[in-house]
Amino acid sequence: GDLNRLGIDVACDAPGVGANYHDHHGAAVTWYLDGIQGLDGQDRGRNALRNLRDYVLHRRGLLASTHVDAGACVDTTGSGRPDVQYNFAAFAPAGPDMPRLDGNAMVMNTTIMQTRSRGRLGLRSGNPADGVTILANALDDPRDLATLRRGVRMACRFYDQSPLREVLGAPIWPPAGLDMSDGSETFEAEIRARAESKGHPTGTCRMGRADDPGSVTDHAGRVHGVPGLRVCDASLMPSAVSANTNLP
């Protein structure tokens, strides 16, 4: 394993450490707003100062909100169990790979609730300051890709319903005219390019029975074979819950 490769003394042989990495992955279905003002620009200039003042002095305003105005957990297969989570917000996501838009927009974050793909977390070097390597393997399992396809298609149907459609302009993503059928390679490429972590990495010290070579802890987070050591975060979940991982 990583310890032997890096010349680190092994106190306990636990091959499950770092395995079973998974996350909630999704994509941001985004459209321009038309004729109404969203939240874009509220974090800059005078708007930012006004919002800060309202919160500091009165505990009200935008900073007193999560900015996620609505959400839904939806069964896209008819199985009786929700498999896609939606979160709605009146602004467009931005980041290193997604520059700010010129206009107002709204986003429907579309997230897989039961991730099947599994990756691995590893050591970069023997120096703990160097951080770790992460092989996410996002959408590696075809069931995850199929779920996100269904979720994105349903999100677009939501956008096309009245009265929401009356305040929307052009689609940003998925782009207008995209073939979103199951067999569309273009749709698959778009989803793979846009898929992102929703911030719920889980599972790399999963709990289980002591005779299970892939388990790391027991049900109370006690590490097998290392007295006095516990794991107390979401890494001990064998599978991520079908919700934000801070919920339990």
What residue spans do the PLM features occupy?
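Glycine-rich loop(s) and the adjacent beta-strand/alpha-helix scaffold that form part
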Residues: 1-52, 62
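FAD-dependent oxidoreductase catalytic-site/capping-region signature
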Residues: 33-38, 51-248
